[in-house]
């Protein structure tokens, strides 16, 4: 009789013995060949919760059953649904069907010139193929309709990839073909010129509204250029840049020059073509810059450099169509004088600010005005934003991004010892208020430079703003202030002398009115619906450090986010590989332990067997000795 040693229970090391899925097996073998999410129904890879290894797949996990279970209907049924939907003329609405019909929707939605083939056909034959991994680890492709398997990639997929490449190539820089943008722009320019020659003082609100609405459906895209690539309009407006390097004292007689290589009459007709490289004409741009150009002109009469925004280099002011305010300033550019350093004059920057704010409100843009007010804190930030407005065309007029940059720049108030503006808006009243809170004239700011040769601007421009009352009242206020400024003969007033009176200022420019001239030109016509907010107060500005938040603003934040996601992916992959290595090592060690256990059991059994034999031999010895 042989006694067996009782086998001890093995130590559990936290890993289950059987069905132990390793992470590298559960990593998705996602198909790189077709991006549509329809291949999830054919996905033979089990997700990480399914414990069975991929080569021992149960029948219920096969792609067809999986899809029928999850979607609740078979493939034929869903294909039938797609056909019905497409016959009705609509694309599918439920997200599941959307994902299966991805290619059809893609081709119909992108504004491509290629006709949408996939939306007309009943289904895409490429959807029948799915990609799988064989037990040997190689990829193979399976057609669920014909039940054919093959090693090489099916030709339907290759055709679909080719189609998608073409559509994406065309969709990058394409417009609907049914609109002739160049002809529209030329007609608009011609109409505006006729209108101006006949009636220079006022402009009918209907014309303005139709003009604005004509631009509103342009999708806020760049105007098409026939001779330049899509990147050209972005880089080339820099040629029309104002040179801030010149000294502020050398303000020349004329605000802007006609660039000799573009004759003015040619310019307006060339608007969407090659001349766009110099500066985009207002007719082809989005509404925001147009009104920007105009209102700036109306709000800073005092220093006649301001047709900077309204008269483009190479365009007389009379050729620029006013969109939201129809004041016309007869400024004639002198041909060969150099471009003035507009952006060096802080007074001018202060005066350009209200125009920007009024423009944003007139266009009903929901931009937070307080961010611009923060930007007004420093001269450098104002310079940068206005430099962008003056030099860049519609490409730079993604207003929200512009203002986020302004908010960043406003943080430089901590370094400058100038007291920042605190602009408060009374949300209940539509009029613009000016309140005397900070009336400390600073000595370190550049005083108002008298511009000696001012072009004759005698008539007060009429304001016909159809959009909103606030804008027009604020503009008349700023015009009165600039008129008073002119009558006083450009006395040097500090731009930081921001006097505000919490009651409405008297419309008659009296003798004491000059103290609040600069204030009114800088006061922002706040929209009544804009929520009341104020910029950094001087005490807070002392504690504000731009460097601490610079990394979470604007493009550095996007860059950091991309880096973080890339690092996260890498860490995940590395972790998976490391985990799989550790798992295999652990299994190896566990098998060694198992071998040792088996050897120990064998030894124990051998010892027991030998003891048994010893006992039997002793018995036999005793019997022998007894018999002897």
Curated annotation (Swiss-Prot):
GO terms for cellular component: nucleus. Residues 599-625 form a coiled coil. GO terms for molecular function: chromatin binding; RNA polymerase II complex binding. InterPro entries: WAC (IPR038867), WW_dom (IPR001202), WW_dom_sf (IPR036020). It is found in: Nucleus. Residues 123-156 form the WW domain. Residues 101-121, 230-260, 299-331, 467-486 have a biased composition (Low complexity). Acts as a linker between gene transcription and histone H2B monoubiquitination at 'Lys-120' (H2BK120ub1). Positive regulator of amino acid starvation-induced autophagy. Positively regulates MTOR activity. May negatively regulate the ubiquitin proteasome pathway. This is WW domain-containing adapter protein with coiled-coil. The gene is wac.
């Amino acid at each position: 009789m042989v006694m067996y040693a009782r086998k001890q229970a093995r130590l559990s090391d936290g890993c289950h013995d059987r069905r132990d899925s390793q992470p590298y097996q559960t990593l998705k073998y996602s198909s790189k060949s077709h991006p549509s999410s329809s291949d999830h129904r054919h996905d033979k890879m089990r997700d990480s919760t399914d414990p069975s290894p991929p080569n021992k797949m149960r029948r219920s996990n096969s792609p067809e059953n999986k899809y029928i279970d999850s979607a609740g209907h078979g493939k034929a049924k869903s294909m039938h649904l797609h056909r019905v939907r497409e016959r009705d003329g609509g694309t599918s609405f439920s997200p599941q069907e959307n994902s299966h019909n991805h290619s059809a929707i893609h081709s119909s939605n992108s504004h491509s010139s290629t006709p949408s083939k996939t939306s007309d056909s009943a289904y895409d034959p490429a959807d029948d193929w799915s990609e799988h991994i064989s037990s040997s680890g190689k990829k193979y492709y399976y057609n669920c309709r014909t039940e054919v398997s093959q090693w090489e990639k099916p030709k339907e997929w290759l055709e679909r990839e080719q189609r998608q490449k073409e559509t994406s190539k065309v969709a990058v820089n394409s417009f609907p073909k049914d609109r002739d943008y160049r002809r529209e722009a030329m007609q608009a320019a011609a109409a505006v010129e006729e209108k101006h020659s006949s009636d220079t003082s006022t402009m009918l609100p209907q014309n303005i509204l139709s003009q604005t609405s004509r631009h509103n459906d342009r999708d806020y895209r760049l105007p098409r250029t026939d001779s330049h690539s899509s990147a050209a309009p972005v880089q080339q407006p820099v040629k029309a840049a104002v040179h801030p390097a010149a000294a502020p004292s050398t303000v020349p007689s004329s605000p802007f020059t006609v660039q000799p290589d573009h004759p003015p009459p040619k310019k307006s007709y060339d608007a969407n073509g090659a001349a766009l490289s110099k500066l985009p004409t207002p007719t082809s741009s989005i509404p925001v810059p147009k009104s920007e150009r105009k209102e700036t002109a109306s709000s800073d009469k005092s220093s006649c450099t301001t047709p900077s925004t309204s008269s483009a280099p190479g365009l007389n002011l009379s050729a620029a169509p006013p969109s939201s305010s129809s004041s016309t300033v007869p400024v004639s550019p002198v041909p060969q004088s150099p471009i003035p350093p507009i952006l060096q004059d802080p007074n001018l920057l202060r005066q350009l600010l209200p125009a920007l704010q009024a423009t944003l409100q007139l266009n009903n843009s929901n931009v937070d005005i307080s961010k611009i007010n923060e930007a007004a804190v420093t001269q450098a930030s104002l310079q940068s934003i206005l430099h962008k407005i003056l030099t860049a065309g519609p490409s730079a007029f993604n207003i929200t991004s512009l203002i986020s940059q302004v908010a960043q720049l406003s943080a430089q108030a901590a370094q400058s010892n100038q007291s920042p503006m605190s602009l408060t808006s009374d949300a209940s009243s539509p009029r613009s208020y000016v309140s005397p809170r900070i009336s400390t004239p600073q000595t370190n700011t550049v005083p108002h430079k008298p511009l000696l040769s001012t072009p004759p601007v005698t008539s007060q421009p009429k304001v016909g703003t159809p959009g909103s009352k606030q804008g027009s009242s604020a503009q008349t206020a700023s015009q009165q202030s600039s008129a008073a400024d002119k009558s006083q003969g450009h006395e040097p007033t500090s731009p930081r002398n921001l006097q505000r009176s919490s009651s409405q200022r008297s419309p008659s420019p009296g003798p004491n009115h000059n103290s609040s001239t600069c204030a009114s030109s800088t006061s922002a016509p706040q929209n009544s619906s804009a929520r009341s907010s104020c910029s950094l107060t001087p005490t807070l500005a002392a504690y504000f450090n731009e460097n601490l938040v610079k990394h979470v603003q604007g493009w550095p934040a996007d860059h950091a986010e991309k880096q973080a996601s890339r690092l996260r992916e890498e860490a995940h992959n590395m972790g998976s590989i490391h985990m799989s290595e550790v798992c295999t090592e652990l299994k190896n060690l566990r098998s060694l332990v198992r071998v040792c256990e088996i050897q120990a059991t064998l030894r124990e059994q051998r010892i027991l067997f030998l003891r048994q034999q010893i006992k039997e031999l002793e018995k036999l010895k005793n019997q022998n000795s007894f018999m002897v």
